[in-house]
Amino acid sequence: MGAPDSRVVRQHLLDLQSGIVAVLERFDGGRFREDAWQRPAGGGGITRVIEEGRFFERGGVNFSHVIGGAMPASATAHRPDLAGRTFEAMGVSLVLHPRNPYCPTVHMNVRFFIASHPEAAVPPPAAAPVWWFGGGMDLTPYYPYEEDVRNFHRACRAAVLPWGGEPEYRRLKEWCDRYFFLKHRNEPRGVGGLFFDDLGADGKTDFDAAFGLARSVGDAFLDAYLPIIERRRDVAYGERERDFQAYRRGRYVEFNLVFDRGTLFGLQSGGRTESILMSLPPVVKWRYDWQPEPGSAEARLYDEFLAPRDW
């Protein structure tokens, strides 16, 4: 069983960030602003953001590596045994908000945690570091095409199959459907994808296998998303479509600020707020008790896509 190697993970994450940004810049024609930052309490990161691009209204591809003296509450709520441990948390997180409402918003994240006991005198196995990977990707369309959703899920499935076969893919797909769900609205955020967390925290998982799955998910992102926006970037739209896009973006904001573990962890651990909140869309609307017109394209999103299903 391979030993956890945070240096190898860190380098992979930096390479992943750079590779994705290079492709997205070629697609958009604009440049991502790069902002390297240091965290006074330990660690730092590289934020890469595009705003008012030719295609992307707002998007970010962020790397962070945070070092702390005690795990924050969001990370220990379901693992009280980790309270008081020092930690390293590193990851790449991206969110892209295209301007064209026929192009979906997308999110992808790959992260690695390692928590160590601060007291060297603690005997094993209690003193052994606890590590795990998390991540996934999910799609949030406004005017969805079944072809696009199927393309996305095919790429997700292909990323997981070498690391656990069909049962593991089903598990991560269903986990995604459960996780990206707005309980107060009783509706999913989008059409799902993959989600996993605590991979390796049981102490029985091989590090190389866990890292392999996490790496495969990150590497699959461009195959999952790029064909969709290449097909839809020139679809004509008007004020009605932009208005509905802004309304549905409100669900994105609600989920990220109320439920998302990564957002809560970042804020509670003293992460960089500007980088954490880059996931929020630039234009959002809320309406009181709005309902789509029956039979409309907007109603089709609710009736046919916003429910867990096999794609």
Curated annotation (Swiss-Prot):
Its main location: cytoplasm. Disulfide bonds: none annotated. GO terms for molecular function: coproporphyrinogen oxidase activity; metal ion binding; protein homodimerization activity. Residues 252-287 are annotated as: Important for dimerization. SUPFAM superfamilies: Coproporphyrinogen III oxidase. Pathway: Porphyrin-containing compound metabolism; protoporphyrin-IX biosynthesis; protoporphyrinogen-IX from coproporphyrinogen-III (O2 route): step 1/1. GO terms for biological process: protoporphyrinogen IX biosynthetic process. Its cofactor is a divalent metal cation. Pfam families: Coprogen_oxidas. It catalyses: coproporphyrinogen III + O2 + 2 H(+) = protoporphyrinogen IX + 2 CO2 + 2 H2O. The active site is at residue 107. Its EC number is 1.3.3.3. The record marks 184 as: Important for dimerization. GO terms for cellular component: cytoplasm. Substrate binds at residues 93, 109-111, 270-272. It comes from the Bacteria. Keywords: Cytoplasm, Heme biosynthesis, Metal-binding, Oxidoreductase, Porphyrin biosynthesis. Belongs to the aerobic coproporphyrinogen-III oxidase family. Involved in the heme biosynthesis. Catalyzes the aerobic oxidative decarboxylation of propionate groups of rings A and B of coproporphyrinogen-III to yield the vinyl groups in protoporphyrinogen-IX. Homodimer. PANTHER family: COPROPORPHYRINOGEN III OXIDASE, MITOCHONDRIAL, OXYGEN-DEPENDENT COPROPORPHYRINOGEN-III OXIDASE, MITOCHONDRIAL. This is Oxygen-dependent coproporphyrinogen-III oxidase. It comes from Aromatoleum aromaticum (strain DSM 19018 / LMG 30748 / EbN1).
